[in-house]
Amino acid sequence: MSVPSIPIVFSHANSFPASTYGVLFKSLKARGFAVRAIEKFGHDPQYPVTDNWPHLVQQLIDFTQAVVDKAGEPVFLLGHSFGGFVSLMAAALAPTLARDVLLIDSPILGGWRATTLGVIKSAQMVGSVSPGATSQRRRTHWADAEAALEHFRHKKAFAKWDPLVLRDYIAHGTHDEGRGEDRKRVLSFDRAVETTIYNTLPDNLDSLLKRHPVKCPVSFIGGTHSAEMKQVGMAMTEKITHGRIMLIDGSHLFPMEKPLATAAAIEASLLCMPGVV
């Protein structure tokens, strides 16, 4: 008799469709986990991108509810960067769905930094200081898939990616468009959506979590060279996780750089959660 797989709902980082993480998911499957994921947040008109992401959180809640109904039990909520934030908010607002939450390089913004972000957003200056300032100028098309691969292979943020993960990103993060001489390879994750997600980053997490405290354990895995951890700080993350923090060698995008090591770290982190046998 086979042992049933442990259900995970995984949420991707902004601009990277869930299928980009195929190598990671395959390794998690081999470790006894069944991963389900929304392919692209922000692209379903029923769940538009608005300030502080309430509809994106609701999309994750609705998706997770279906997984929980089928599994007959709460699930692990995992998320990378943006995905960690929506996972945490979903667990806070729908506590019966989450068994545990694992934040993958998703340092929680709180205190004076959150207040400052709120002021910047109110002054409509966020587009000049958020990652959206870069994403709104991102290249969106190439001659073909190989040209796209060569482009990203030489970008600093992608240079250390596992080659198989980069191939998956080209396969699932871009697609062919047009016919004949007009045929080209284009980004699948809408650049405008990516930028809007960055520019509507929640500044209300502190107050939301005070009103709706997360009732399940929360843990964190970060990259040793993560610029995001340094920018945001770790004070609120340490408070929420009660010190359940693990570091893995790599940048903010370490799941793409070292997917197999990341899968091992995820397994270790989840199995160390309180109440997990």
PLM region spans:
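Glycine-rich His-Gly loop
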Residues: 10-14, 80-81, 223
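Short glycine-rich catalytic loops that host catalytic nucleophiles or stabilize transition states
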Residues: 38, 246-251
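Conserved hydrolase catalytic core segment
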Residues: 73-116
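Flexible "cap/lid" loop of the alpha/beta hydrolase fold
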Residues: 101-141, 230
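Conserved serine/cysteine hydrolase catalytic core
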Residues: 164, 173-238
